[in-house]
């Protein structure tokens, strides 16, 4: 199962303070819009999303079809195929992608400890 690029999406209290903190660790703004309270910070192949007021808990995010620079991969497992595979294995999904659609789609699941995992396909 190819899940694509991995990032952690953090619920932050003050996006400006968090931006400065991660810049001190060598991260640079890669994407996002601070005026809309979200930034994607990058340090080599490591991605950290900073989100102020958008969700309650931190989220592990995988992007099927993307590499760590948000370039489309030539070969990847579509989120709907991943969804079918997970359902066959008995994994409970909190949110499902429309199986009759194509292109962008997402699914949400929880690990055994209650950590949220988002598979968010943009291509």
Q: What residues fall within each predicted segment?
A:
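N-terminal beta-strand motif that seeds the catalytic metal site of vicinal oxygen chelate
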Residues: 1-19, 123
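Loop/turn position at the start of each blade in beta-propeller repeats
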Residues: 3, 36, 102-104
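Vicinal oxygen chelate
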Residues: 13-16, 54-55, 62-116
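Structural preference for long, well-ordered alpha-helical segments within the folded cores
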Residues: 20-24, 113
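Conserved acetyl-CoA-binding loop of GNAT-fold acetyltransferases
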Residues: 23-30, 91
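Conserved short beta-strand elements that form part of the metal-binding/catalytic scaffold
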Residues: 28-70, 116-121
């Amino acid at each position: 199962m190819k899940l694509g690029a991995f990032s952690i999406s953090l619920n932050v209290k003050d996006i400006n303070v968090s931006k400065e903190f991660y810049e001190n660790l060598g991260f640079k703004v890669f994407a996002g819009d601070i005026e809309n309270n979200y930034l994607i910070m990058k340090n080599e192949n490591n991605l950290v999303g900073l989100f102020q007021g958008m969700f309650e808990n931190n989220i592990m995010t995988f992007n099927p079809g993307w590499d760590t620079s948000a370039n489309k991969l030539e070969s990847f497992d579509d989120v709907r195929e991943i969804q079918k595979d997970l359902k066959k294995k008995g994994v409970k999904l909190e949110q499902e992608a429309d199986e009759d659609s194509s292109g962008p789609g997402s699914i949400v699941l929880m690990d055994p400890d209650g950590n949220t995992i988002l598979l968010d396909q943009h291509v």
